[in-house]
């Protein structure tokens, strides 16, 4: 059998040419090797790429490919076993990358139990006839990098990395064939030095534009000094860095400046900025595009518009020098097992990863997250920057107790003191009522109130509107669709800029990096990190003649949500009059107390995930361990998932000034037009509801299916209030955001 007689893929619709298997596996091997150079596994990746499709040489597989080529059906015959068995003795657990390159990483026990089937010997003979260099892979020393043997967690991350390199290379070479390209499309190495020069030039111009016509404030001077001091430290060795920058100190720009300078200094391939909320992702990506250019910055999250094929490809594998994404995308990819999630993972090797608002990482997953970051920094050339005004004390957890965390600010207490722009007032004992808070807010000319749940926001909004009938009162929550929220925020910013009266009642979504500046902020009692984030919306630019006010209140008729109670309990014990939440020493004490109280070191979920990682059981990590009794059922509550809520999206057609949403929904129902493009256009009209809320009978009755069999997307047919969004009469009131 000659090389051109064995095919990997059916003819390209562009060229009409079949894809020769020998050509495909060699190209995949070369590409995977180039990806794995950055983490010292080039030879291993090459070997896996070379054998990954060996099973396609079976007569049965080739015959089926010929039959289905014209219809576009899948062959549906296993082709992974032969290649995995060929390299199993030398690649050990990494051979799972071959056995899982379509279905995903499994568990090492399944690989160990894998045995040849009748016909495999003949298939292997045919494969070696067309790819003779693969015969050398059967025997010899281990292909695994020596460092992977230092600990099970290093080996586990290595398997993930080489799996990522393989599946990305496989997809790229297959796509090149399908689109009639001469070679896979891979971006050239970034000129980080050039990006630094562009960033600095545009930063100076942007700051000059912002300051045009006004005096330089004390805040401006502190921001400038902080930036210069932090960037000077970018020459430091790769590792873990901490940026304890107060809200309003220019953290977004300073973190990016450090990351770019550090990348240029140390030959890093890219910068990945991960933030906890989509709203911040969009806002930060806009700033970075202004500084670096649209072609440099890849914005990757659920709401990103990626109409250009090049951008869609880059989003699949993060082949871009500057990526802005969410922590959900980052960590669900890092701990995922499916090829689509894992393709981008190898881009984290030899990269600078900025974790913005790092205090928002979920407590139940802290141990596996921090352990993975430690492995990345020690063995895969990654530098991690922890950026937050409320810096968690991760070094007090056992998983990081031996890690050297390099501070980028020598005197954080002095920095926070210089940038102190507010004074805290506490109304917690005696407790006020929401009506009393509404009375206080109504007496203000400009004020922001932040409460803990959607229901509380609705109630307080109506109370304030009743108390201040002549004022412009605006409500914000995620029960409003994104277009509605954008309109409201534009209105709020316009009134603030013009010095006009405006009173805003919001859930905590406004704390998520939304740049607004009020003279006074009222904040319902919450964990200390939320109080400080709220304070960042008061006197943000330091323009008031005195200090802004932050009023912390504990309303008797607005109880603290269950999931906040541990943090609130510690907050009340440590902070209060004269003991502000922006005191770094008190924050350190708060986090230590919180970690101990929640027993983060020993928390069940993190411990189970870590045990599954030790056992190289990638299914258990991503999908949860098998329940007692087997049967294939898994405990999803013990899986690695950044978002525990399983949300349902409802499309709001009523809030649509251009009357287009209804038309788009109809296109979804009839299947006219590309599904992805229609869904992207509808993002601005979607409201995300917790599944427990959406499936309640009285809510479900107001939802109409959009796509048959699709239980996560509905058309909302209930009321949509012009102020508060989805009709509160049909929705529960105890949901955050």
Residue ranges and their predicted role:
Residues 1-9, 518, 540-737:
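C-terminal accessory region of SF2 helicases/translocases
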Residues 1-207:
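Accessory nucleic-acid engagement/destabilization modules that flank
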Residues 9-13, 278-279, 298-310, 452-455, ...:
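Conserved helicase motor
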Residues 67-80, 475-482, 486-489, 500-561:
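Conserved RecA-like helicase motor core of SF1/SF2 enzymes
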Residues 254, 259-261, 267-291, 304, ...:
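Conserved Walker A/P-loop ATP-binding site and its immediately adjacent core
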Residues 270-281, 440-465, 475:
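Conserved strand-helix element at the start of the C-terminal RecA-like helicase core
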Residues 293-335:
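Inter-Walker segment of RecA-like/P-loop motor cores
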Residues 389-442:
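Interdomain hinge/linker at the junction between the two RecA-like core domains of SF2 helicases
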């Amino acid at each position: 059998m000659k090389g051109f007689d064995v095919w990997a893929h059916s003819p390209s619709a562009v060229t009409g040419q079949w894809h020769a298997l020998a050509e495909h596996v060699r190209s995949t091997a070369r590409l995977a090797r180039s990806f794995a150079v950055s983490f010292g596994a080039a030879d291993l990746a090459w070997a896996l790429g070379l054998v990954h499709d060996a099973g396609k040489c079976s007569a049965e597989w080739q015959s089926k490919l010929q039959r289905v080529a014209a219809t576009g059906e899948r062959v549906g015959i296993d082709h992974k076993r032969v290649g995995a068995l060929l390299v199993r003795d030398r690649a050990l657990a990494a051979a799972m990358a071959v056995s899982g390159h379509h279905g995903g990483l499994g568990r090492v026990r399944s690989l160990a139990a894998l045995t040849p089937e009748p016909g495999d010997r003949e298939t292997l003979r045919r494969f070696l006839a067309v790819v003779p260099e693969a015969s050398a892979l059967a025997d010899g020393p281990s292909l695994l990098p020596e460092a992977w043997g230092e600990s099970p967690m290093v080996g586990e991350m290595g398997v993930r990395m080489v799996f990522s390199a393989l599946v990305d290379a496989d997809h790229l070479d297959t796509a090149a064939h399908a689109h009639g390209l001469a070679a896979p499309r891979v971006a050239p190495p970034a000129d980080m030095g050039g990006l630094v020069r562009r960033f600095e030039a545009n930063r100076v111009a942007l700051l000059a534009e912002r300051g045009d016509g006004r005096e330089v404030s004390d805040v401006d001077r502190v921001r400038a000094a902080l930036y210069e001091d932090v960037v000077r430290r970018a020459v430091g060795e790769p590792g873990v860095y901490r940026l304890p920058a107060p809200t309003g100190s220019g953290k977004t720009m300073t973190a990016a400046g450090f990351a770019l300078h550090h990348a240029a200094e140390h030959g890093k391939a890219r910068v990945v900025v991960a933030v906890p909320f989509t709203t911040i992702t969009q806002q930060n990506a806009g700033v970075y595009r202004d500084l670096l250019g649209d072609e440099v910055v890849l914005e990757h999250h659920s709401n990103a518009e990626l109409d250009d094929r090049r951008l869609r490809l880059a989003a699949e594998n993060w082949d871009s020098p500057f990526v802005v994404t969410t922590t959900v995308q980052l960590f669900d990819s890092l701990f995922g097992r499916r090829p689509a999630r894992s393709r981008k993972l190898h881009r984290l090797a030899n990269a600078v990863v900025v974790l913005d608002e790092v205090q928002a990482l979920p407590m139940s997953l802290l141990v596996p997250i921090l352990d993975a970051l430690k492995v990345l920094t020690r063995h895969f050339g990654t530098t991690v920057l922890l950026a937050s005004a409320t810096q968690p004390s991760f070094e007090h957890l056992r998983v990081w107790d031996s890690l050297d965390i390099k501070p980028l600010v020598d005197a954080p207490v002095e920095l926070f003191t210089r940038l102190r722009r507010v004074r805290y007032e506490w109304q917690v004992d005696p407790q006020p009522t929401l009506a009393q808070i509404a009375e206080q807010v109504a007496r203000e000319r400009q004020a922001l109130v932040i409460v803990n749940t959607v229901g509380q926001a609705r109630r307080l909004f109506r109370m304030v509107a009743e108390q201040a009938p002549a004022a412009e009162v605006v409500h914000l929550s995620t029960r409003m669709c994104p277009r509605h929220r954008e309109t409201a925020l534009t209105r709020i910013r316009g009134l603030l800029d013009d010095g006009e009266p405006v009173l805003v009642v919001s859930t905590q979504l406004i704390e998520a990096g939304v740049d607004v500046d009020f003279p006074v902020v009222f904040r319902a009692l919450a964990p200390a990190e939320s109080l400080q984030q709220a304070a960042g919306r008061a006197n943000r630019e330091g323009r008031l003649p005195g200090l802004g006010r932050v009023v912390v209140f504990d309303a008797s008729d607005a109880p603290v949500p269950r999931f906040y109670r541990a943090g609130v309990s510690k907050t009340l014990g440590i902070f209060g009059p004269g003991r502000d939440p922006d005191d770094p020493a008190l924050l350190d004490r708060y986090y230590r107390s919180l970690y101990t109280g929640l027993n983060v070191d020993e928390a069940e979920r993190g411990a189970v995930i870590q045990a599954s990682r030790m056992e190289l059981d990638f299914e258990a990590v991503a999908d949860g361990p098998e329940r007692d009794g087997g049967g294939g059922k898994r405990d999803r509550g013990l899986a690695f998932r950044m978002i525990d809520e399983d949300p349902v999206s409802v499309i709001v057609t009523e809030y649509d000034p251009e009357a287009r949403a209804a038309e788009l929904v109809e296109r979804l129902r009839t299947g006219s037009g590309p599904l992805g493009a229609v869904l992207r256009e509808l993002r601005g009209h979607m409201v995300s509801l917790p599944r427990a809320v959406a499936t309640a009978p009285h809510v479900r009755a107001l939802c109409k299916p959009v796509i048959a069999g699709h239980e996560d997307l509905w058309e909302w047919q209930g009321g949509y209030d012009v102020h508060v969004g989805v009709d509160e009469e049909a929705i529960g009131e105890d949901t955050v955001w």
